[in-house]
Regions:
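Active-site core of bacterial EAL-family cyclic-dinucleotide phosphodiesterase domains
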Residues: 29, 182-240, 263-266, 270-274
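Hydrophobic scaffolding residues in well-structured cytosolic catalytic/regulatory domains
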Residues: 8, 26, 30-33, 94, ...
Length: 274
């Protein structure tokens, strides 16, 4: 009976596909490590996201995706020290807990081993596939007073790694938090616009250099709001690069431009190129 209980406990704390720790196990371990670190060195958490994993699943199939996840797990085991905890947090997200680090510089060789291992060639069923990862790193107590802050700051570092070239590791710095908060505010504002406001094009005439006549218009994004202010493109600049918000904003603007052009033409007005 005791063996059965231990087996069930192991199953509850591990990821069935890779055999790594699962999210619950990892979070509990981080909480314990930060609470008991004392003067025994720094604690670090690494959050890893596989680049282009969805594309691999879509083009090579889920069998290839599962094989890649298992390979990543093995490569992480080979790159890390005995006692380091590796977890699969879900999907293509992995995490590593490092303890007893003498200083921040001790991270560098570990990160180099991880990236070297993960970026090595990988193939499935004779088909070469790219295996690269973006990594966000945060140190305790330097980057957070508790495990909640540590996870948040590692996640922010990961966000910047993914949005600045991918395939790299970034250590959290305070300025990353400021940048993340600004970008998050832009995305939140864009979501509000799509749900509650009516963005509309403002038209700027294009003038012919030959005769000074109007040959068309440029449609400029503007969004008047109830308080009388106007949301400008720079206020939501990050949203235009977002994979979901960018196309949604573009579609909303294109619909308005098409409606305006149709109305002008119905009145016999020459629109030109917009």
């Amino acid at each position: 009976r005791k063996e059965t209980e231990l087996r069930l406990q192991r199953l509850a704390m591990s990821d069935p596909l890779t055999g790594l720790a699962n999210r619950a196990h990892f979070v509990a371990a981080v909480t314990q490590a930060t609470a008991s670190s004392g003067d025994r060195g720094l604690v670090a958490i690494l959050l890893l996201d596989l680049d282009e994993f969805k594309r691999i699943n879509d083009t090579a199939g889920h069998d290839a995706g599962d094989a890649l996840l298992q390979t990543v797990a093995e490569r992480l085991r080979g790159a890390l020290r005995p006692g380091d905890l590796i977890a699969r947090m879900g999907g293509d997200e992995f995490a590593v807990l490092l303890t007893r680090l003498p200083d921040a510089e001790a991270l560098q060789p570990i990160l180099m081993r991880i990236t070297d291992q993960l970026h090595a060639p990988f193939s499935h069923a004779g088909r070469p596939l790219e295996c690269r990862a973006s990594i966000g790193v945060a140190l305790y107590p330097d980057h957070g007073a508790d495990d909640v802050a540590l996870f948040k700051h590692a996640d922010i570092a990961l966000y910047h790694a993914k949005n600045n070239g991918r395939g790299r590791a970034i250590l959290f710095q305070p300025h990353l938090l400021d940048s993340w908060e600004r970008e998050t505010a832009m995305l939140d504002r864009a979501r509000h616009i799509l749900s509650h406001e009516q963005p509309c094009p403002w038209y700027q005439p294009k003038i012919s250099l030959q005769d000074g006549g109007i040959i068309g218009f440029e449609a400029l994004f503007r969004c008047p709001v109830a308080d009388g202010s106007i949301i400008m493109p720079g206020d939501i600049a990050r949203a235009f690069e977002h994979p979901e918000l960018g196309p949604a904003l573009t579609e909303r603007m294109v619909e308005r431009v098409i409606d305006d052009c149709a109305r002008w033409r119905s009145k016999g007005l020459a629109v030109g190129h917009v």
